[in-house]
Regions:
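Terminal intrinsically disordered/low-complexity segments used for targeting and assembly
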Residues: 1-33, 69, 191-232, 282, ...
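Periplasmic alpha-helical coiled-coil/stalk elements that build and connect Gram-negative outer-membrane
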Residues: 1-2, 25, 121-238, 347, ...
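"Short basic amphipathic alpha-helical interaction patches in structured regions
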Residues: 82, 101-109, 148
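Hydrophobic alpha-helical hairpins/lids featuring a short glycine-rich hinge
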Residues: 116-118
Length: 449
């Protein structure tokens, strides 16, 4: 039985089709699931909600509150206060020099949280893309190794036959057997890595630890190294800009604390109280109160002028030092980002050349297989030249497989560097949109098992 589950986020997502303990999934679907299920994104979203609530809190001090309280009991002796049955009171801030800075600080904090969320989303996207590309590369390497192992076992059989006919040596047989065993061991290690990558992707996407496989044609072509490094419009990553906004928030908070002393603060208050003297001797001690209204209403404007406050002064000094530290920390983070991007550009250019070199080596190995096969088909030509044997043909095929695996590894390393550059230059989202368009055009039959 085939189980189909589809996810959508404003568009039709390519479904994940599962059979037993394995499933194929497109790149765009993997990224979408990770963005909605990864705990790091959830934590960043919660931080944004907290920052939004903090901003609302700084503004709500101007909104009048409403409080009700009451109580009733028997009193004896001299009354110590008004016999209030219940009261309603409301109070709000009217003016405070520091509050404007507090609002600006909270707004900058919200901006920092949103940028941190963008940074975390990009990090999750990068993690998923790199893991997906690695999985796709390893799966192709596994297919190549399967053919390579078949060629190696064929070589062992040929050398064994030649040894039995007295045309080869036991040393060559042992070497052929060792080659086959080494390929078998390498393939087992590769399959372990594939299982690890599949489990890692499943965890990123919030799925069960099913065996995931990549869909090669769901991966759009990556741009050139030059385009990935130079075409972006983003000078700094969202993480760096988040640090800048956070430092600005701390600076505004420092301003607010420094504007506390010798500056007036005004608040508005309203109070209504219901008085009852029936259960105590209040009228006895204050006879003029008898027969008067038992309703009390007061409206007041309160002003406070802090003159001397060592606690707030030290808090202001602490905030100023923290703002200064955040500023220099931001400068350091900015420099580290620029240094890392410069090194990545140089590294990507080198990996590009290495990939070209691996492609040439693989082409040479392919041509060598053609030459040896042609000579064997033609009967080795003239008797004066070097005679080709089936052993030479199998060795040429093994060399071709090894060069193909080297090429796949070089191409993955280059692709990883390009993805890193796309993220740092702000182009990763555009590239993933291309992946989405590709996924929408893949027929369902292409993702079945």
């Amino acid at each position: 039985m085939r189980l189909r589950t589809g996810w959508a986020m404003g568009f039709v997502m390519l479904p994940v089709l599962a059979v037993g303990a394995s499933a194929q999934i497109s790149l765009s679907s993997a990224v979408d699931l990770a963005l909605r299920n990864d705990p790091r994104v959830k934590m960043s979203e919660a931080a944004v909600q907290k920052a939004h609530a903090a901003l609302s809190e700084t503004r709500d001090v101007y909104v009048p509150n409403l409080t009700a309280n009451g109580g009733y009991g028997q009193g004896f002796g001299v009354p110590t206060g008004l016999p209030t049955v219940f009261s309603l009171s409301s109070q709000s801030l009217v003016f405070n020099y520091s509050q404007r800075d507090n609002i600006r600080a909270a707004a900058s904090g919200l901006a920092a949280a949103n940028l941190a969320l963008s940074e975390m989303r990009e990090q999750v996207e990068e993690d998923v893309v790199v893991a997906y590309l690695n999985l796709d590369s390893d799966e192709r390497c596994d297919a190549t190794m399967t053919q390579e192992y078949s060629d190696a076992t064929r070589l062992v059989a040929i050398v064994q036959d030649r040894l039995n006919a007295g045309q080869d040596t036991r040393m060559n047989l042992l070497r052929a057997q060792r080659t086959a065993k080494q390929i078998e061991l390498d393939q087992l290690n590769l399959q372990d890595e594939i299982a690890t990558l599949s489990d890692h992707l499943s965890r990123l996407m919030g799925l069960s630890a099913d065996r995931l496989t990549a869909i090669e044609n769901s991966i759009p072509e990556l741009p050139s190294v030059h385009a990935a490094a130079e075409n972006g419009s983003q000078s700094y990553s969202p993480g760096v800009r988040s640090a800048v906004a956070s430092a600005r928030s701390k600076q505004q908070l420092s301003f607010g604390l420094n504007r506390y002393r010798l500056r007036p603060q005004m608040s508005l208050g309203i109070n209504y109280s219901r008085i009852d003297t029936g259960q105590n001797g209040y009228a006895t001690y204050y006879p003029s109160f008898a027969g008067k209204s038992q309703n009390a209403v007061s409206v007041y404007l309160e002003m406070e002028l802090p003159i001397y406050d060592r606690l707030h002064q030290h808090q202001a000094d602490e905030a100023a030092a923290e703002a200064s530290r955040a500023h220099f920390e931001t400068e350091q983070q900015r420099n580290q980002f620029l240094d890392g991007r410069f090194k990545l550009k140089r590294s990507a250019a080198e990996l590009d050349k290495r990939s070209d070199l691996a492609q040439i080596d693989q082409d040479i190995a392919q041509e060598q297989v053609k030459v040896v096969s042609a000579q064997l088909t033609a009967g080795n030509g003239s008797s004066g030249g070097e005679q080709m044997t089936p052993v030479d043909e199998q060795n040429a095929k093994l060399t071709e497989s090894a060069r193909t695996i080297d090429l796949l590894h070089a191409q993955f390393q280059l692709s990883q560097a390009k993805v890193n550059l796309l993220r740092q230059t702000g182009q990763l989202d555009d590239w993933l949109k291309a992946a989405m368009r590709i996924s929408e055009g893949i027929p369902a039959s292409n993702v079945s098992h």
